[in-house]
Amino acid sequence: MNASVKHPHTIKDEFELIQSATDYYLQRDEKWWISGRFFQHELISIFQPVFSISQGQTMGRAAYIRAKADGEIVLWPWQIFSLASKDEQLVELDRLCRAIHASNYYFNHPYPSDNLFVEVHPRLLESVKDDHGQAFENFLDLIGVRTSRVVIEIPVTVNRNWKLLRHVIANYRSRGYLIAANYSIGCSDWMIKLGSLYPNIVRITANDLIQQEDIPSLVDSIHNAGASLLVREIETSIQFATALKANADYLQGNLLGQPEQAITTRDLLHRV
């Protein structure tokens, strides 16, 4: 066993600490995986590897929420969040999901130095005026994880509101989080618009990358801004080859690794 893997008694102690210090409805199974409850649904984490081309292995994993019943997935993220019709319910659900993700990732991950990628709901960004990420930072402090180990994925819909996008990036960055923004196809000057608030990572789908007329110029503009390029939703060998040829930094997609409720190895990119 890797020396960085936490022993069951350590996880138990930390889980009890979380229960005593928060009002999250959490539970753990016999394998020490933590789940939560929202509107009678059991919420679980699944993780998809994000690969670093230069390292040839995972540099992190993207976390997604699912609702499970009788061992089967019954609700997908958009269905789960649709249950939160009120802003206060949305805030509660979002914080619960992040707590579940962070607990599972850092309690069960054999390589705790890898980054955790977490999504943020666009409605949450609009309903929380300031101090984005403060509640999550408090939870990370509780379990002993630095915010610099977490990548906040800003939803692509926020690109339509530049004022909000700049405000959100500044908020999260001030707390030490890494920021991943999505490239907007057809908006070539968006990096310039962000001014000095360049994200750490720019995400683009494999399909959108292939559709670019001048891929080298796009990639150069991202790298010149000091950001790394992550190509996601890689499903085919052609998309994979295009991402490699484009000089992308990070890769993610079902071709490389399916989302699953397990973190067992530091996957190697050359297995593809």
Place the predicted regions along the sequence by residue.
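Active-site core of bacterial EAL-family cyclic-dinucleotide phosphodiesterase domains
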Residues: 19-81
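Distinct, well-ordered alpha-helical segments
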Residues: 126-141, 161-168, 187-201, 243
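Extended, compositionally biased accessory segments flanking or bridging domains
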Residues: 72-75, 85-91
